[in-house]
From Swiss-Prot:
Keywords (A to Z) from UniProt: Ribonucleoprotein, Ribosomal protein
Listed GO MF terms: structural constituent of ribosome
Designated name of the protein: Large ribosomal subunit protein bL27
Entry GO CC: cytosolic large ribosomal subunit
Domain of life: Bacteria
HAMAP family to which the protein is assigned, alphabetical: Ribosomal_bL27 (MF_00539)
Region described as Disordered: spans on this chain: 1-22
Species name: Nitrosomonas europaea (strain ATCC 19718 / CIP 103999 / KCTC 2705 / NBRC 14298)
InterPro entries in the cross-refs: Ribosomal_bL27, Ribosomal_bL27_CS
PANTHER family the UniProt entry points to: LARGE RIBOSOMAL SUBUNIT PROTEIN BL27M (PTHR15893:SF0), RIBOSOMAL PROTEIN L27 (PTHR15893)
Pfam families the UniProt entry points to: Ribosomal_L27
Swiss-Prot/TrEMBL GO biological process terms: translation
Length: 85
């Protein structure tokens, strides 16, 4: 009887799905209240005027308006604001 010894099982073969992070609306674009501006891990971008921050650090518009990105303060923080239209 021909026998073949069992091959070892690999410990590879797993991968996580991409999380689709990043800037969703850019400076100068018009956005509706509740619209997502940035999806991020941690605060790469900080909320400015009329921008809220979600539990997962997502930045969203609180009012309808135009998006403005800026670098502010001593720490050169990147902020996102919405100017009401």
């Amino acid at each position: 009887m021909a026998h073949k010894k069992a091959g070892g099982s690999s410990r590879n073969g797993r991968d996580s799905h991409s999380k689709r992070l990043g800037v969703k609306r850019y400076g100068g674009e018009i956005i509706r209240a509740g619209g997502i501006i940035v999806r991020q891990r941690g605060t790469q971008f900080h909320p400015g005027d009329n921008v809220g921050i979600g539990r997962d650090h997502t930045l969203f518009a609180k009012v309808d308006g135009k998006i403005v990105f800026a670098v502010k303060g001593r720490m050169n923080r990147r902020t996102v604001a919405v100017i009401p239209s």
